[in-house]
A protein has these predicted regions:
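Alpha-helical transmembrane segments of multi-pass membrane proteins predominantly involved
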Residues: 1-221
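Single conserved hydrophobic/aromatic residue that forms the stacking wall/gate
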Residues: 219-231
Length: 231
């Protein structure tokens, strides 16, 4: 019983983030117009507490080594949480406008869901968990890009993001299938001993890196405004 409890507590970063996400979701559903003015500072305070919770050192591998928690991963998660808190602080004025005031809950929930996916990517000890975390981060991020769906620029950017994410996922999974086929493992710790530098493994690495590059949008794409200027 104690071992199970300690294993669950090793997920304190993810569990605390899920708790903040649920609080933001329920507050958006049930909070009245007068109480919404406390929405922004409350979420920022909860995120600040979550950053401090991430700094608690813990070293443990869960789910057969597929999830790994170390002091280094805790530091990286704290940096990601601090970046998210900075985004929330900078977005206060934008969310306070009349045309975006009603989108506060959606913005917080989608941003926190993206951060949750990044947490799983950081603690991944297996390519499967890494891919699941990548998709958990990409799908809410696509919704964030198209948050202002009635504006042409936002809708087009969301469509581009979804298409590029689909293409990158196909490349990444194709690369992972070659990695597993040539090495027989998807665990990060076991993979270096299985790599032989064959042409097929090099091709698999190229596919994986290409998929990651497309998912990170490491390429240029002209916006509608740029195309109008070029004309």
């Amino acid at each position: 019983m104690n071992s199970n409890l300690s294993a669950i507590l090793s997920l304190h970063a993810e569990l605390s983030l899920v708790l903040i996400l649920l609080v933001a979701l329920l507050a958006d559903l049930f909070a009245g117009p007068l109480r919404r003015r406390w929405f922004h500072p409350a979420v920022c305070v909860l995120m600040a507490l979550q950053i401090g919770l991430n700094l608690t050192p813990d070293t443990r591998a869960l789910f057969g080594g597929m999830y790994v928690n170390t002091p280094f991963t805790s530091i990286v998660k704290s940096i990601l949480s601090a970046g998210t808190l900075l985004i929330f602080l900078q977005s206060g004025e934008w969310l306070g406008r009349k045309d975006t005031h009603y989108k506060q809950g959606e913005f917080y929930v989608l941003t926190l869901a993206t951060l949750l996916g990044m947490f799983f990517m950081v603690s991944a000890g297996h390519f499967l968990i890494f891919y699941i975390g990548l998709e958990m981060a990409s799908i809410p991020m696509a919704c964030l890009v198209a948050l202002d769906k009635y504006r042409h620029h936002s809708a087009e950017a969301g469509a581009k993001f979804i298409l590029s994410t689909m293409f990158s996922s196909a490349l990444l999974l194709y690369g992972l299938s070659f990695i597993y086929g040539t090495s027989g493992t998807l665990y990060f710790a076991d993979l270096p001993a299985m790599l032989q530098g064959s042409a097929l493994q090099q091709f698999a690495l190229v596919l994986f890196l290409a998929g990651m590059g497309f998912n990170c949008l490491l390429y240029t794409s002209p916006s509608p405004r740029d195309r109008q200027k070029s004309r």
